[in-house]
Amino acid sequence: MAEKILMREGRLIIPDRPVIPYIEGDGIGRDIWSVSQKVIDAAVKKAYAGQRSIQWREILAGEKAYELTGTSLPNETLEIIREHLVAIKGPLGTPIGKGHRSLNVALRQELDLYACVRPIRYFKGVPSPLKEPEKTDITIFRENTEDIYAGIEWEAGSDEVAKVISFLQDEMGVVNIRFPESSSIGIKPISEEGSKRLIRSAIEYALEHQLKMLTLVHKGNIQKFTEGGFRKWGYELAKEEFATELAEGTLVVNDIIADNFLQQILLAPENFQVVALTNLNGDYASDALAAQVGGIGISPGANINYQTGHAIFEATHGTAPDIAGKDLANPCSLLLSACMMLEYIGWKEAAVLIIQALEDAFINKNVTLDFAKILDVAHQSTSQFLEVLIDSI
């Protein structure tokens, strides 16, 4: 009988047949989810000889939710994730500059999924622009709930922005808004609590995985109290809570300016292991790093609250509506995110089977169209790629 995943005394309780909600996603979401579900089920069945299985429960968000319920993110979806703790999702679209709230950001904020975790590693056989892509093996911890993603901004010419600018000028003595009559204004909240819980999770991850280097990436040379605060609070936390590890040398904490970090991950990526960043810097850096190992089409991601146990594992790329329904999509981002999910619930053996199947496919140049064009080889359709993986498992 299927049961819910529970959190007790800070630990996940995983039944042999957990119920895991999924969001199919927009665009190519249906294409890549149907493949991913079959691969996950096959790996779990093989790894545990049929003694474990996942009962999938569809929940709605995005276009499908809007068509069926009139809203893109129904309250029921949020409640089901809260109740079941762990979920997985395909890509969700948000119109640019239309005033619509990003569904991805909404999920993270509504569920307080404060850590965006993106492990970036190279798989042999995947096309990369770097000569030595195998040197890139970095796990990103991006703060997920603060920074400019809080969505506190006002449009140029609005009554609201006029009030904000007037307050800044009249009450706060601000004189360096260059064009106040035509400026939009945004606010960037960065808190001690938000920074420390993210950095704490990054350090705990590093120690759990026998990685001793944690790097704080920031723009504190310009934004002294927000980005600079992130850096300051990170060092404070390390000294307060991990003094023994620092003294023993099992943990080393350092920091780097964000623009220099983007240079160094190209010049010397081997110098970084686990990296903690504020929200916007993390957004830039995670996709830049993904490009070094094959792109976001093969980049997994998870949004996690380590305190409550809630987690959503997701495809990190867009909806690619131009190839939706054409059997051309690359499911690797979602599959690797599924591997993260399996590891999160302690089913590492199943995750290993999927990763091994992907590694074999890449080495043998059994790849989808996006990689095939770069490698100049015949491509596998999405459904053919599924068959390759199932045969390997």
Question: What do these predicted ranges mean?
Answer:
Residues 65-171, 184-185, 280-284:
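N-terminal glycine-rich phosphate/adenylate-binding segment common to multiple enzyme folds
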Residues 36, 40, 234, 334-342, ...:
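Buried hydrophobic packing segments
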